[in-house]
Amino acid sequence: MEYKIEKQAKGTRILFGDEVRDRYTLLNKMIATVESYGFQGIQLPSIEPSEIYIDKAGKEVLNQMWVFPDKKARNVCLRPEATATVQLIANHFWQAKKEIRVWYFEKCWRYEKPQRGRYREFWQFGCEVINPSTDLIKEELIDISKELCELQTKDITIDYSVTRGLGYYTDKGFELRCKQLGAQEQICGGGAYDRGIGFAIGFDRLMLCK
């Protein structure tokens, strides 16, 4: 069930009861799946220095970021996506490590025009592989992302060569789509970046698929 209250911020959602139960049921299945492939969970900050995304995010994301000064007049933002933060962590802690596999389930924020499947406050489930040990990692991640999405729906198509809208990607990426969602059919996107590769699933959109 979804509630609406007076003066609720546009593009946010209040969920209750069966809806919340179903979300956690799917989430727990997704976590069990990726951990069977050697991924470990990571939790990330929701508030970041906005400069993290200036060079890494594409123009569309930059225009949608929630940016504001903190009490010391430093520009910070609500996280618009998670991969850029994982990249920074990798550069600080995992440079000399062998392959590292992480998963995350994080709330993100973008100032978009709200509609079905597109919210200003939304959840992403993602997987990142740092220092991949095989040239076949992209194919493996596509298979894993498909397996995750098929926990909810079999109505999945894959585009194996997509130009992604984030500045840190170094090659063609991939997308998974659910046609029944219409204009908001993309439910997963991923690709390679410096020293890593990963994908993120729009969890709220995936929940709309049947």
Stretch-by-stretch model annotation:
Residues 1-210:
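TRNA-recognition modules of translation machinery and tRNA-sensing kinases, especially anticodon-binding
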